[in-house]
Amino acid sequence: MYSTTDFRKGLKIELDGTPFEIVDFQHFKPGKGGAMVRTKLRNILNGRVVDNTFRSGEKVGRPDLESRDMQYLYHEGDDLVLMDLTTYEQLYMHEDLTDGKAGFLKDGQQVRVLLYNGKPLDLELPVSLVLEVVETEPGAKGDTVSNVTKPAKLETGIVVQVPIFVNQGDRIKVDTRSREYLGRE
């Protein structure tokens, strides 16, 4: 159990049997009565953000969340097939649960998977990945007046905007949160 004094951004709590993540919180004391804590909570299951107010010292539950190291094996229809690195059990995770992160996965890649009551909820990828450009248009000479970009298809199939000097076969660093080009490797 957590007390409201334990609240901080990113803390995961359970309320009415549903796991939430604290997005924002603020302690306040009204003119009359005890102190209160206003929170913005993100429902981990569906992503909705709700406001909730707690009395100071109120207790809330800890969700049954677990983070495990797994290896991405392959796609099967709309599912990702992952293997637990400790038990070697295979786990199926629907692609919609990944918020588009599945586009960064290569066969054999190691990822962290967030589980709630044994069911997969989310993938945790590194902040940046190095991927190879498999398809892009050649840059035009002299077209460097401003910050010009062009689309480039990467080895995992996702398309990102890259500067014109990036060519097919180059290995580039990509931010997995914003899908932005970070530099060449």
Curated annotation (Swiss-Prot):
<keyword id="KW-0251">Elongation factor</keyword>
<comment type="pathway">
    <text>Protein biosynthesis; polypeptide chain elongation.</text>
</comment>
<dbReference type="InterPro" id="IPR008991">
    <property type="entry name" value="Translation_prot_SH3-like_sf"/>
</dbReference>
<dbReference type="InterPro" id="IPR014722">
    <property type="entry name" value="Rib_uL2_dom2"/>
</dbReference>
<dbReference type="InterPro" id="IPR012340">
    <property type="entry name" value="NA-bd_OB-fold"/>
</dbReference>
<protein>
    <recommendedName>
        <fullName>Elongation factor P</fullName>
    </recommendedName>
</protein>
<comment type="similarity">
    <text>Belongs to the elongation factor P family.</text>
</comment>
<dbReference type="Pfam" id="PF08207">
    <property type="entry name" value="EFP_N"/>
</dbReference>
<dbReference type="InterPro" id="IPR013185">
    <property type="entry name" value="Transl_elong_KOW-like"/>
</dbReference>
<dbReference type="GO" id="GO:0005737">
    <property type="term" value="C:cytoplasm"/>
</dbReference>
<dbReference type="Pfam" id="PF01132">
    <property type="entry name" value="EFP"/>
</dbReference>
<dbReference type="Pfam" id="PF09285">
    <property type="entry name" value="Elong-fact-P_C"/>
</dbReference>
<dbReference type="InterPro" id="IPR015365">
    <property type="entry name" value="Elong-fact-P_C"/>
</dbReference>
<dbReference type="GO" id="GO:0043043">
    <property type="term" value="P:peptide biosynthetic process"/>
</dbReference>
<dbReference type="GO" id="GO:0003746">
    <property type="term" value="F:translation elongation factor activity"/>
</dbReference>
<dbReference type="InterPro" id="IPR001059">
    <property type="entry name" value="Transl_elong_P/YeiP_cen"/>
</dbReference>
<dbReference type="InterPro" id="IPR011768">
    <property type="entry name" value="Transl_elongation_fac_P"/>
</dbReference>
<keyword id="KW-0963">Cytoplasm</keyword>
<dbReference type="InterPro" id="IPR020599">
    <property type="entry name" value="Transl_elong_fac_P/YeiP"/>
</dbReference>
<keyword id="KW-0648">Protein biosynthesis</keyword>
<dbReference type="InterPro" id="IPR013852">
    <property type="entry name" value="Transl_elong_P/YeiP_CS"/>
</dbReference>
<comment type="function">
    <text>Involved in peptide bond synthesis. Stimulates efficient translation and peptide-bond synthesis on native or reconstituted 70S ribosomes in vitro. Probably functions indirectly by altering the affinity of the ribosome for aminoacyl-tRNA, thus increasing their reactivity as acceptors for peptidyl transferase.</text>
</comment>
